[in-house]
Amino acid sequence: MLLPEEPAILEVRHAVRHWIAAHAPDGDVAVALSGGADSLALTAAAAVEARSAVALVVDHRLQRGSADVADGAAARARTLGCASAEVLPVDVTGSGGLEAAARQARYEALDAGRGTRPVLLGHTLDDQAETVLLGLSRGSGGRSIWGMSPYDSPWGRPLLGVRRAVTRQACTELGLDPHEDPHNSSPDFVRVRLRTEVLPLLEDVLGGGVAGALARTGEHLREEGAVLDAVAADAEAKVVVDGEIDAALLALSAPPVRRRVLRSWLLAAGARGLGDTQLRAVDDLVARWRGQGQVAVGGGTPDARLVVRRRRGRLNVGLDDRRRV
């Protein structure tokens, strides 16, 4: 399909072309298509910029008529020039609330359906700003406000520099009528309230440019964090011996490096839901040792929790009977 050379669609195409050149030089991609403006504009651009683009449409089956919406989105993808379009029905179950469960089901379906292709997601600069703001509100360290990466294999995000208004305008230029998901305007979801209440207020009070500033902040922190991660990886190779950490040797490292080493080590040992409070408590075993007891870090088994202990100058991870808590 030939696309009109209008400003918005050209901006989207440029972003997709740049992403493919950087991350998918063979030109084969999958696109996650919901039928909304962001993913529609992305699909239209990918269909002409990629060597081969396939559309994956996840039907969460949470609303009446969702199958018709999914089928319509798939048909539109074929019209736009995608090599194929597949509807992936999912069951949304699990803990953490509807948003989290739907996200998990969606990503699992996309991963199963993509084959060997990277999956392009329609996250925009506005989504990036919301993500950074959410991370900031949690106060769990610099990593939480990095925002989303342009490529976190297999997930690609070509539109992180494109405003949501541009994708909507691109759909208008293409004569496409995006599907409006009721969940995207429901105040029951924190991200929706950020989008419709908090960010507009910040833009008004601070005189505009807030979304772009938040996105740039996340990008800068992500770049700086990558350097610290590399330093921490070198340090980890030196201080971890037979699965245990030499506390005195790690204590010589700067605090951000120490915590990165500990985070990597704990995750490799099976820690789950690791938060800033837990990480700092483990860091205290290294840098502020005064004979304190073990630190629970999340994870383990139904009968035993995962804990970190310091013994004879080394940190080790073990299990502790939950019934003794």
Curated annotation (Swiss-Prot):
As one GO molecular function, the record gives:
tRNA(Ile)-lysidine synthase activity
Reaction(s) this enzyme catalyzes, per UniProt:
cytidine(34) in tRNA(Ile2) + L-lysine + ATP = lysidine(34) in tRNA(Ile2) + AMP + diphosphate + H(+)
A GO biological process held by the record: tRNA modification
- The answer to whether the entry has keyword rRNA-binding is no
Q: Which InterPro entries does this UniProt record tie to the protein?
A: Rossmann-like_a/b/a_fold, TilS/TtcA_N, tRNA_Ile_lys_synt, tRNA_Ile_lys_synt_N, tRNA_Ile_lys_synt_subst-bd
Q: What class of enzyme is it?
A: ligase
Q: What GO cellular component term, any one, is given?
A: cytoplasm
**Subcellular location field:** Cytoplasm
Give a yes or no for keyword Ligase in this entry.
Answer: yes
Q: SUPFAM superfamilies, alphabetically?
A: Adenine nucleotide alpha hydrolases-like, MesJ substrate recognition domain-like
Name the major location.
cytoplasm
Q: What is its EC number?
A: 6.3.4.19
Q: Which HAMAP family match?
A: tRNA_Ile_lys_synt
Question: What is the UniProt domain comment for this protein?
Answer: The N-terminal region contains the highly conserved SGGXDS motif, predicted to be a P-loop motif involved in ATP binding.
Protein's name in the database: tRNA(Ile)-lysidine synthase
Source organism of the structure: Rhodococcus opacus (strain B4)
